[in-house]
């Protein structure tokens, strides 16, 4: 076989071998940017914590729930980065605090739902429990109602942090959302009570 004929014979074989030996090209996938942690409304957080409380005690009832503002989570109207709730079990004679947080944070806040240690509880002492079915109004709705009747205060205090407190106040028949301009009741000079069942504005506190 001539040199030219041999080259013509070997060329396809060389090309085939080189094609087989090439490493497959990997397609680089661009990673989608991580979503920032999102705040929740009061009812959303309650619905995360209540099943956990029922798992601890089937007769668990809420006594109080409050918002917890976090620097890591951008707040929105009627929403907070973390929430804390106290549930009681008359059958066990115990109370237990649960928290929901969008992120790991100071103050023993863990991402998701976290249960605290059960403590002694005596029926008739302290705040009264209420039925979960009474919680029909969410915090974003409570905020809208409170803000509508608080425009003068908001104009003078546009950057105030807003907090939320849910409890059964002895002055009102239904549980109430207290919309608080400030980090807490004690640190606030203005708050509004909203009926958590009907959504009605009940009282302004100065």
What are these regions (language model features)?
Residues 20-206:
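Long, terminal "pre-/pro-" and other extracytoplasmic accessory regions
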Residues 1-18:
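Sec-dependent bacterial lipoprotein signal peptides
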């Amino acid at each position: 076989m001539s040199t030219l004929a041999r080259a013509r014979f070997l060329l396809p074989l060389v090309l085939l071998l080189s094609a087989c030996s090439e490493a497959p090209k990997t397609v680089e996938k661009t990673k989608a940017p991580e979503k920032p942690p999102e705040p929740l409304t009061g009812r959303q957080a309650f619905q995360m914590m209540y099943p956990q409380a029922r798992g601890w005690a089937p007769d668990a009832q809420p006594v109080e729930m409050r918002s917890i503002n976090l620097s890591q989570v951008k707040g929105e109207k009627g929403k907070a980065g973390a929430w804390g709730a106290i549930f009681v079990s008359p059958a066990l004679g115990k109370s237990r605090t649960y928290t929901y947080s969008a992120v790991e944070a100071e103050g023993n806040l863990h991402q998701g739902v976290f249960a605290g240690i059960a403590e002694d509880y005596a029926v008739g002492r302290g705040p009264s429990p209420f039925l979960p079915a009474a919680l029909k109004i969410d915090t974003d709705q409570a905020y809208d109602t409170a803000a509508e009747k608080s425009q003068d205060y908001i104009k003078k205090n546009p950057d105030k942090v807003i907090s939320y407190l849910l409890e059964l106040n002895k002055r009102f028949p239904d549980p109430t959302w207290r919309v608080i301009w400030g980090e807490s009741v004690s640190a606030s000079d203005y708050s509004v009570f909203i009926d958590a069942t009907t959504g009605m504005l009940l009282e302004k506190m100065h």
